[in-house]
């Protein structure tokens, strides 16, 4: 006789683990609460359910990540991480607490109403954390640079007005201009910019270290072929390809590009009824890192679809099956972008539409590798 399944919903926080255990095809379960230690919780459940049961745990995807999943599976129990945004909600249910959350998870899990998420390997998770840290450092550096430019404007130092052109900030020319301004500045301003410059240089050094490590990782066997498939796209270099690969994971789990579009939050919100159609902005209910990289890569939609010097260099020794998909993508988003632009669509909307198109081709390229 097979063991009965015990469905266990977990609500996890820093202070307590709340659990609700319910036997399959039964209506009443039992609540548990323990200190934040999964082994203590499992011990409590086993003391209550002394018969032989197969434990099926589930919990929402939260800040706890995959650590709890690996702790549970390590001791021989099954565990599923649930997509929090896809948990069914009742409009009349206005009471929420940890105990009820755990109960709802257990009941919905037993009825098969929950959607599991993809679990990466430990190596993929660690590499993704490294890549995200590099993005975090880069964002920090941008904020400090913006702060420095704001201070200059408060002091009446306007670089673009002085140079009589729309020059970019933080070029060598801009740095030389700033040094000249600081010669006659007060001691407080000199001290302020000395610290700011040290911060910017320190973050630049950290960025270089991260990027060197990412380039080294890109040569590993599990990433090398995927990198080749992506760097033949215009607008995607090795660093951008590493971000896409680590964030997308195994693309075979997406049976159609539309599902990948939803995962990236590039779907268009729609509220249509009867003969009336209402479409709004993109949902943004998905991976922001993928959206950002693709939008940046799609900036070149209005350029003539030709293979430039840098792209030709990146495409050396890459199989034709990858370059063929990338070329189709380049021509497609150029045609699509021009069409939307001539219709008078806002530039940012055009870029987003091109990014959505591009994601479908990337799905095809990565599936060529995995298949």
Model-identified regions with their sequence ranges:
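Short, basic/hydrophobic alpha-helical segments
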Residues: 38-56
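Glycine-rich, often acidic, oxyanion-interacting loops/wings at catalytic, nucleic-acid
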Residues: 135-227
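Short glycine-rich, Thr/Ser-proximal phosphate-binding strand/loop in the N-terminal lobe
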Residues: 13-40
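Basic, amphipathic alpha-helical segments enriched in Lys/Arg and hydrophobic/aromatic residues
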Residues: 335-338, 342-371
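Phosphate-backbone recognition surface of nucleic-acid-processing proteins
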Residues: 229-232, 238, 242-343
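Short alpha-helix plus adjacent loop in nuclease-associated cores
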Residues: 81-118, 276-284
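Gly/Thr-rich phosphate-binding beta-strand-loop-beta motif of the actin/hexokinase/Hsp70
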Residues: 2-23, 105
